[in-house]
Amino acid sequence: MNQTVKVKKKKKTITLGVVHIRASFNNTIVTFTDIQGNTISSASAGGNGFKGARKATPYAAQVTVDRASEKAKEYGLKTISIRIGGPGAQRESAMRALFGQNFVVTSILDVSSIAHNGVRPPKRRRV
């Protein structure tokens, strides 16, 4: 009689990590990584059931941060550094949601890319 034994994989404990928040005009993406950049958990507003213009709301960003941080806390993450980028209006509410998750925040860094007269903008919208 052959029996298979399931071996439960041991989760790594990571105490220090980086939170990458990308707040675009259309969506919010939150990624928790370790110091080397390996992804621990990630979530997006679209993946949390928000569709269309509701993905770009501050409430959607708050829910996204809550979902991603729940997964990251399973790894024992306690101390984070925040890297926030993008032009979206959800930046502030995403950071407030992170402060409410009882993480120790060591630094906040704005990594938004600033165009120095780079590419041509899209044509004006006609309604």
UniProtKB/Swiss-Prot annotation:
Residue stretches in coiled coil: none
Gene Ontology BP annotations: translation
Pfam families: Ribosomal_S11
Annotated Gene Ontology cellular component terms: ribonucleoprotein complex; ribosome
InterPro entries from the UniProt entry: Ribosomal_uS11, Ribosomal_uS11_bac-type, Ribosomal_uS11_CS, Ribosomal_uS11_sf
Keywords: Ribonucleoprotein, Ribosomal protein, RNA-binding, rRNA-binding
Gene3D superfamilies tied to this protein: Ribosomal protein S11
UniProt-recorded Gene Ontology molecular function terms: rRNA binding; structural constituent of ribosome
Superkingdom as given in the UniProt entry: Bacteria
HAMAP family: Ribosomal_uS11
Record's subunit section: Part of the 30S ribosomal subunit. Interacts with proteins S7 and S18. Binds to IF-3.
Described purpose of this protein according to its UniProt entry: Located on the platform of the 30S subunit, it bridges several disparate RNA helices of the 16S rRNA. Forms part of the Shine-Dalgarno cleft in the 70S ribosome.
Stated family: Belongs to the universal ribosomal protein uS11 family.
The protein's name: Small ribosomal subunit protein uS11
Gene source species: Rickettsia rickettsii (strain Sheila Smith)
The organism's taxonomic lineage, starting at the top: Bacteria, Pseudomonadati, Pseudomonadota, Alphaproteobacteria, Rickettsiales
